Amino acid sequence: MSETGQRESVRPSPIFLGLLGLTAVGGALAWLAGETVQPLAYAGVFVMVIAGWLVSLCLHEFGHAFTAWRFGDHDVAVRGYLTLDPRRYSHPMLSLGLPMLFIALGGIGLPGAAVYVHTWFMTTARRTLVSLAGPTVNLALAMLLLAATRLLFDPIHAVLWAGVAFLAFLQLTALVLNLLPIPGLDGYAALEPHLRPETQRALAPAKQFALVFLLVLFLAPTLNGWFFGVVYWLFDLSGVSHRLAAAGSVLARFWSIWF
């Protein structure tokens, strides 16, 4: 690969930069809405949350890819995983469309995108770190957004901060979901290197049913209550009221008022 090609394989893609810009535009609209619930407020929070969530999906997968690259899998650069281009991360519908649908229907940050990294030559500890890198990004984003809300919240711009709080809430749902030891998710991938080879082979077919397991989690009242109990507990540790995130959810999912 030429030097120019190498630079392009790690340079942030125009699409990712466009998503960042769109997030900023949504934030600006929410800021201009002030504290008044009006069409501008719904539009601003919707754009900020959806674009911001896509940005976080790219950063999550970049976390996996960059960690793998640091540990020796330099093919991730060739595959474009270090460009933060959402088109590089698996199937567009399953990786991007499905998470958007889950946000629209239930306000849940579903992990969707995926990068394929080579970890077979890595130590057990490094394989685990590669798997945990993505959820770590979600945790860092949640902490950053909640810290900003806690320190900078101004009732005059309540619409903006409601959207920021909801985006942080989505990061925490993604964190908890990803850490579940369900085959196909990061939590299981972090544990898999520590399992016996025969156990790994026995559980491998279950990875294709990860979405089914998640649907059971969301539809079973007891499991659903446990899941959101953990998410709300983590959210409340920040000192930010989860009612602010609930308000942001209503603004981002404005159709839920009527349906």
Swiss-Prot record:
The active site is at 61. The chain crosses the membrane at residues 14-34, 39-59, 97-117, 128-148, 156-176, 211-231. It is a multi-pass membrane protein. Keywords: Cell membrane, Hydrolase, Membrane, Metal-binding, Metalloprotease, Protease, Transmembrane, Transmembrane helix, Zinc. The keyword ATP-binding does not apply. Signal peptide: none annotated. This is Putative zinc metalloprotease Rip2. It comes from Mycobacterium tuberculosis (strain ATCC 25618 / H37Rv). The gene is rip2.
